[in-house]
Structure formats: structure tokens, C-alpha cells
Swiss-Prot record:
This is Phosphoglycerate kinase. Belongs to the phosphoglycerate kinase family. Pfam families: PGK. Monomer. Pathway: Carbohydrate degradation; glycolysis; pyruvate from D-glyceraldehyde 3-phosphate: step 2/5. Its main location: cytoplasm. Keywords: ATP-binding, Cytoplasm, Glycolysis, Kinase, Nucleotide-binding, Transferase. Its EC number is 2.7.2.3. One of its GO terms (biological process) is glycolytic process. The lineage of its organism: Bacteria, Pseudomonadati, Pseudomonadota, Betaproteobacteria, Burkholderiales. It catalyses: (2R)-3-phosphoglycerate + ATP = (2R)-3-phospho-glyceroyl phosphate + ADP. One of its GO terms (molecular function) is phosphoglycerate kinase activity. It is found in: Cytoplasm.
Amino acid sequence: MQFKRLSDLIARNELKGKRVFIRADLNVPQDGKGNITEDTRIRASVPAIRQALQAGAAVMVTSHLGRPVEGEFKPADTLAPIAQRLSELLGQPVALKQDWVDGVDVAPGQVVLLENCRVNKGEKKNDDVLAKKIAALCDVYVNDAFGTAHRAEATTHGIAKYATVACAGPLLAAELDALGKALHQPASPLVAIVAGSKVSTKLTILKTLADKVDNLIVGGGIANTFMLAAGLKIGKSLAEADLVGDARAIMDMMAKRGASVPIPVDVVCAKEFSPTAIATVKDVADVTDDDMILDIGPKTADILAKQISQAGTIVWNGPVGVFEFDQFANGTKTLAHAIAESSGFSVAGGGDTLAAIAKYDIADKIGYISTGGGAFLEFLEGKTLPAVEILEQRATS
């Protein structure tokens, strides 16, 4: 992928005295009183802001927060708590500016936070008139919000069409570099772990990866559907019988080119889905009609861990069992530690995956952890991300 980078502009001393507009992803969780409960995204946005300030730029930053109604600003929509947290992290004042579309006063070395961009009429529809107005505020546009890269909106796409210079910030660039390395130039063997409750929500990803990977490890309800496709009984486990044909087609397609979808040889079952359910390990042939499969078994986990240990590249999206309940967590824990200990390059993403990484304290052992939920999945699906595509177009025009 070819796109301009903020770091390149800084290296060429092209930001001094310039007005820089940064689209960040500051959409953080808050409690009922508006207090920020988790600030990872704010901390992740700091390098781009700090780099632009140190390069002598006048910096404007904006983000969406929640789902405001366009044209109707409410107190719950405000970025005020984020301005305060940014100020603490940067060690300098961060003023919050409302009604900013028609003009912003900011001097070199200063940073202002522009109020929730999704309150502006036309933001979500990528309105051209709005995009041109916002582009006129700056000399350089920086997209540093991978989490919204799959959306074509005025501050993610439209502005990039019209700004004098449009580039990727360090967070977006690192994300694209890592995902490109994993999917476009992977060291082999390439192993993907795709897990979740439904095949239907990840069918496109499964089909796309089936063309590329050497081993496609499936988990959760997705694995149950593949077990049905392999002719195994799954009791009363969550599965999608109408997608058994698709699962079988994916298995056949991969087998033809010498790749595989490893089907579990043993599973962890229970009679009910609850935190206190009694877990029983069974060979797959012994699953009964009243069993619910809630994790892969230890033999399966060891087989898969060995495949992961030999991988050159690993893409991880989803825990393979109900890891929130400890008695059904061994599969996810075993694979998580195998990924952490592998010498291969690993990329992980998706909310449940991030929770598993946190639970097993392996964040520093994953090659790259993706910050974008929907954008990460669409990248895995092979879809074009509008906010990235426009940066590529601008780089070549």
C-alpha cells in the first residue's frame, strides 16, 4: 500500500507553521457521569499530536463519540472529558472548540480539540460541501483513526479529497503495515484462527482466508458448524445447519490445495450454559444429544498449539471457547500462550480477542494488536477501506 505518512512530512520539515487537522479515534467508554473508564484510544492518539506539535504545527484534532443526532448537540455528546485527559497526557492545555466548521483559531505549538464531529450535519453522509469546508481549515490532513477507516464520512474520506496534503498518522500507518505484512506478504505457513458464535457473521472472512492460509483454525459456534459438515454429532450446541454446505465447500476448497481446517478430536461439554456448569472432556465421537460444546478439548488444543508454534504468520480473531468461564477457557488459554511463544509474526484483533489477550497478559508478546473492530474484520474480508483508498489515490495523484 502506497500512501503519504506524517513521519515523511516531518522528516522533510514540511509542518513548521502549518495548520494540521488530525482525525483521531477518541471514542472511549464512559460511565453514567461522563468519566472515562478506559483511555487506550486516547493514549494511542498522543504520538501523532505530539509529533505534529514538535514539528512546529498548529494542531486541530477531532473525533466522534457515541452516536449523536446530527445537528442536535447534547451534553452527553461532548468531548470535554477527552480534552481534559489529552491535556494531562500532552502536558499542555487542550482547548475544546464548538461550532468549528467555519473557522478555528490556533497558533503553532498549540492544540485544540474540535467538538464531536458527528454532530455536524452531513458528516456521516460524507457531504461534499461539509468536507470542503473542513478541508479549508488546514494545510495538512492526517487520518490516524483506523477504527473508522471502513466508513466514508466527511472527516475520514471527504476531507482527504480536498485537503492540500492528505496523509496517514503513525497509528493508521502501523496498522496498515502490520495487516499488509500478515495478509499480503506473509511468512509461511500462514495460520488463521477465526472463532465466534456464528459462521454467518464471518462467512466472507472464512472464504477469503480459505484462499490464502495453510491452516484455518475455527472455534466457538463456527467450529460446531464445521463439525456438522464433517459428519460429527454436536448435541444441542450452537450451530447453523443452513451453512453446513458453505462450511463443507470451504473445507473442500482448502483440501484441494493441500491446506486444511483442523476439526477437533475432543471437546469440553456441559449440560447447560452457565458459570457453574460442570465441564466434561469427551472425544468427539462420544458427544451425546444433550451436550453443549463450550470449548475445544486438551488433545485438540495441543495439536493446534503445535501448528501455531510452526507458523510463520498468525492472524487471530476470536477465542475458541467460552473463556469467560474458567472451566471452558483452557482451549483459548493454550492457543493464546502458543501464539505468544511462537517466533512467527502475529496480528490479533476483535473485542473478545483483546479481552483474552488481557486475561492471559500476553499483549507484549503479540506482534501487532489491531485497534479497529469493524475495520479489522473488513480488512480480513479483503474489502477496500474507503479512508485508506482515498489516501492511496491522493499519494499517486
